[in-house]
Amino acid sequence: SYNNPDDELWKVTNELLLSDAVVIFGSIRWGKMNAVYAKLMERLTWIENRHTALGEKNIVENIDIGIISVGHNWNGEEAIKLEKKVMEFFGFKTPNDLFWSYQWTKKAEDESLSGYKKDGKDFDDEFDFIRIVKESIIKFSQFFK
């Protein structure tokens, strides 16, 4: 921003406006998207202000956006539904296939250490996550050789 020379929002904005589609990944903390996501959305309110408050063209109307979240025990689906509405309000296209949440249990009280340990194992079993990450790292490093 003009008043904060260390602000790097322009980097996010440039990539966003050059994209046909954007998928944001985040975690669910205490029933909501995490603080990093919240800060990003707060900083991007200027997008919505352009067409709502200032009557200018919606500069994101042709961009598909989605949000994928991972959480342990509470409110993941509801949080994603809310954030989809936020993206619609911003003026993005919001195809249902780009909004998804993984939640290990629906028991809000499950804060046990054993539950968190089992959560990670179950996630890996369901999505083969560790193997995919290892393969991706190898492919990425080979790309730069």
Model segments located where?
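Glycine-rich phosphate/pyrophosphate-binding loop and the adjoining helix
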Residues: 88-145
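Helix-loop-strand module that forms the ligand-binding subsite of alpha/beta enzymes
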Residues: 2-90
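Functionally engaged cysteine thiol sites
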Residues: 1-7, 96, 106
